[in-house]
Amino acid sequence: MVYIDEHIMDFDLDAALQQVSEQRREQALRFKFERGQRTCVLAYLLLKKALREEYGITANPVFEYGEHGKPALVGHPEIHFNLSHCREAVACAVSTRPIGIDVESVGRYDDGVARYTMNDRELRLIAGAQRPDVAFIRLWTMKEARLKLTGEGITDDLKAALDDAGRWQFTTVEQLARNYIYTVCEERG
């Protein structure tokens, strides 16, 4: 299940900080800028909402971290989640199977970044698209959601991140009127 919130600047941050775990509060307050604090808190609140609505869990979630830094829920190894944020939105995905999500703002297309992160087939798709900026972000969110699902994070070879794409199921949602795209990745089967 996916939860999205676009109201990053529309809540009382001080009050929200009292609704999160001490672990998350400390993490949020390490951000230098308020927007970072807000997205950190809002992502956690979305996770709390998802856990309550999907699994009946009302306690504040506490995280433990895997080998590559991917968070997992303490006491609930059967529940998988992933969080992401961009300037326009915060996203949370929860499942009983490993899951990854990435949300990104649609910005100015940069051919240099594309050449560094995309393989030849992906570059052709972008070049042939009516909106290269959208095509690039669509592919980027797929790569990042896949890498977040496996816990790898951004790797040295981003060009190969989708080489095994047949193994994964991607769901991409384009909210172009709101200037963002998100992709959810789950393993097929």
Place the predicted regions along the sequence by residue.
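Core catalytic alpha/beta fold that binds nucleotide/phospho-ligands
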Residues: 1-189
